Amino acid sequence: RPPKGFKETKAFASVAWDLLKARPDIDLMPPCHQKVTREEDLDLNHLPLLRPWPEDAGGAVTLGLVITKDPETGVPNVGVYRLQRQSAKTMTVHWLSVRGGARHLRKAAAMKKKLEIAVAIGVHPLLVMAAATPIPVQLSEWLFAGLYAGEGVRLTKCKTIDLQVPSHSEIVLEGSISPGEEMMD
């Protein structure tokens, strides 16, 4: 229903203004693009990854944002999932089947497509909070963080895949997951 009277109109305008301010901004000259390592030069062994448990197969990314996109709708998902280094060029991602990234992977598999994935490491804690908070699927984690911060998140386009990442990320990893590609974690 439309707002009735000045008070309701003012409250509606305030919410609309907050939403407008919270929209993500695109950064054309992002700090995360200052140093780019090509795929052939990539060695994940150079990343400062922790081994959380002595029997773990390799180091793990802690508090990295995992960014995927629904292959049908293009709606992004940002989550915090366990990422473990398996080799100099590969990592595993461990997500629960009910989470957004896992849903995107199932859809990509049904379409016989690879799922593009980006990992943003060294981001503002507010972005980690937004990614870890259960919010409705229709609400973007970027918009949620912007609403909380009172200003839009600064994003930039990835170099090799069609995803956006926080432009002030310290490290961005870009890659893809092939349907059916599974490894022990």
Predicted regions and their residues:
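Extended, highly charged
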Residues: 1-185
